[in-house]
Amino acid sequence: ECLALYEELEILLYQTTSYTSLAVSVDYTDTEAQKKDAKMTALAAEIGSRLSFIESEIADAPEELIRAAMDKTGRAKHYLAEILREKPHRLSAETEKVLAALRPVFNAPYDIYHMTKLADMKFGSFTVNGKEYPLGYSLFEDEYEYEADTDVRRAAFRAFSDKLREYENTTAATYNTYLTQQRIMAKQRGFADMFEADLFTDHVTREMYDRQIDLITEKLAPAMRKYARLVGKMNKLDRVTFADLKLPLDAEFDPRVTIGESREYVRSALSVLGQDYADMVDEAYDKRWIDFARNVGKETGGFCSSPYGCNSYILLSWNNRMADVFTIAHELGHAGHFRLCNGAQSLFDTNVSGYLIEAPSTMNELLLAQDLL
């Protein structure tokens, strides 16, 4: 009964914190949204601190008692198994309570980085051959990196990099703070190092991690170097710089895509996953799960948030490019995954390893590519 009530409260917290944090992601310059999110974050930390005794008391119970409870319970079985797995690395109940209260402080490096990047940086414009071009994070990443005009593309890269360089010390100090925090917590919890702690959280062994890095270095790197040379050849570049790597291989074919056309492409590609999945694609467009607008202060790239008990919310900056269509297919992979996951399992079973979480979304990109071919 305790865990059932605890899950209900955690679901409510998940939904409310998602509501306030997503409002900030849409526009980091919205001070009212920031205030609401800060209040909700503080409240969630206070509640988490007050309720931290639940996991501490479970972890302090004899292992045989926890395993007996796992055999009798349904929705909480994996939750109890995870507490048992983490038991050797838990600290005292009082320490865990304090750490839960300090969660907003632990999140500070992430928050500072995003506020610097999305609220404080003012890119202005740059000029090429007497013409002035506006510049921004999304404009650079989603537009100028694909620009066919080499002078404009490379000038945009220089202007963008120059602005980032103005904040390099702040960014470095923020990242160093995060690493210091992670190193200290890893040591306090009895891990050999930060790597072991992070991989433990993701249910991944060091051997798996090293194998992936080695595979990328040994197998992917040569192919990517060959690809870079091919980009230079097909686009008739004097040399290939970092500013040129997003150019299409076919310089003569870079079609613009409307939002309506993106729906047709994505639905066609993903219909192979069944009618329910195709219906979800339609629902995402019809019920406005997707925030397409490109505005100042908006989170860059694309992401999908799937609060338990709610539909998913997808954020991206639409630029009428085929790359955006792939982003939607990718993020709908997360939406489909968590629709099934959340619908069939306890909230406590939805914290998925990063090694698994990107599989459905990457598969959707492959399905889209296959369908286009």
What are these regions (language model features)?
Residues 328, 332-336, 360:
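Active-site His/Glu-centered metal-binding helix of metallohydrolases
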Residues 352-373:
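Post-HExxH zinc-binding segment in Zn-dependent metallohydrolases
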Residues 253-261, 272, 307-329:
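Short pre-active-site segment immediately N-terminal to the catalytic Zn-binding motif
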Residues 333-347:
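Catalytic Zn2+-binding segment of zinc metalloproteases
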Residues 260-289:
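Amphipathic alpha-helical domain-onset/packing element
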Residues 313-317, 344-354:
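Short beta-alpha connecting loops at secondary-structure transitions
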Residues 252-257, 290-310:
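Catalytic zinc-binding patch centered on the HExxH motif and its immediate surroundings
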Residues 1-252, 263:
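A well-structured
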